[in-house]
């Protein structure tokens, strides 16, 4: 299998790409996102739903997936402007919440809210080293930024496997991972718009469901998979409408060219989801117990003992 690029190069490229898109300015995004500044696919309950209600429903879905109401600690990989950690801290009163982002603007915004028990770090998950395990991990809208356009399929799977391997090492044995990501559906990476690659999310490439399942093999059991592509079509259409209504104010903040670029990206994205070119995957995963699956060796190359206490479980319990 082709190994990923040198970590330093990949980390620097990822940080630069994230800041290009997300550091346009908090005020700009506040004009057209919902009140919680949730910048990811919502879960509408019908065409007449409000964006605020649909985003709240999505957050509650992920919190329920990891049983956050019983958690003592939760990690949010790609925390954005903190809508999930806010619900964890203020709604569920989870004592320890950590959010990772590569955007300086997002991190500053969340820190300014001073949510109890919340730590926000401007750090890539590849360099993050927690001092204690988590009961649950949520990652919404970060996974699609991990691979690069010049990665081979084997390299992409290796990059994704790094993510799953690290998440497994950070989770307690009874923990869960709730993952949400855009993915290629009835479209190849060669068909992807050059505009999207260069003007919207530079240096990023989407996964496929097959690549995700291959990368998680023998690390996580996939409990549920949802393809909610029409949810994202609806969300992008809501964002596009709200941005059009605030076009003049948005132009004063970010410039007319930036506003036009965002309007085009939202229109193209909505069309891609409507046509089935793109999909929106929501996966709930739990770590395999006992260190192995189906009689094969564990992801770290060792076998579980007869008592079922595999090496990964022992590591997680001792952290």
Predicted regions span which residues?
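N-terminal auxiliary segments of SAM/dcSAM-dependent transferases
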Residues: 1-31
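Conserved class I S-adenosyl-L-methionine
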Residues: 70-78
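A short glycine-rich, Lys/Arg-flanked "PGG" loop and its adjoining helix->strand segment in the class I
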Residues: 154-173
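Substrate-binding/catalytic lobe of Class I Rossmann-like enzymes that use SAM or dcSAM, i.e.
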Residues: 182-282, 286-293
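Conserved SAM-binding loop of SAM-dependent methyltransferases across substrates and taxa
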Residues: 81-93
């Amino acid at each position: 299998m082709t190994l990923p690029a040198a970590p330093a190069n990949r980390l620097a490229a990822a940080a630069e790409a994230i800041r290009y898109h997300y550091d346009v300015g908090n005020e700009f995004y506040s004009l057209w996102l919902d009140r919680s500044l949730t910048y990811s696919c919502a879960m509408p309950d019908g065409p007449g739903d409000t964006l605020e209600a649909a985003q709240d429903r999505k957050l509650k879905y992920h919190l329920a997936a990891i049983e956050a109401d019983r958690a003592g600690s939760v990690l949010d990989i790609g925390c954005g402007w903190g809508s999930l950690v806010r619900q964890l801290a203020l709604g569920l009163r989870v004592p320890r919440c950590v959010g990772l982002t590569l955007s300086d603007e997002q991190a500053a915004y969340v820190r300014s809210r001073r949510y109890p028990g919340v730590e926000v770090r401007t750090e890539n998950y590849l360099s993050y080293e927690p001092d204690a395990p988590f009961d649950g991990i949520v990652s919404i809208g970060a996974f699609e930024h991990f691979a690069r356009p010049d990665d081979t399929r084997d390299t992409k799977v290796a990059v994704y496997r790094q993510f799953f391997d690290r998440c497994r090492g950070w989770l307690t044995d009874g923990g869960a991972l709730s993952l949400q990501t855009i993915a290629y559906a009835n479209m190849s990476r060669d068909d992807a718009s050059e505009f999207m690659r260069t003007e919207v999310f530079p240096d990023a490439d989407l996964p496929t469901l097959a690549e995700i399942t291959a990368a998680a093999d023998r690390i996580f059991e996939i409990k549920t998979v949802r393809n909610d592509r029409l949810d994202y079509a609806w969300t992008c259409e809501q964002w596009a409408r709200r941005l059009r209504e605030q076009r003049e104010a948005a132009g004063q903040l970010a410039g007319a060219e930036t506003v036009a670029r965002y309007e085009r990206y939202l229109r193209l994205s909505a069309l891609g989801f409507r046509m089935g070119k793109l999909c929106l995957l929501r996966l709930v995963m739990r770590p395999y117990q006992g260190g192995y699956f189906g009689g094969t060796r564990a992801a770290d190359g060792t076998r579980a003992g007869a008592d079922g206490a595999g090496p990964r479980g022992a590591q997680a319990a001792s952290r």
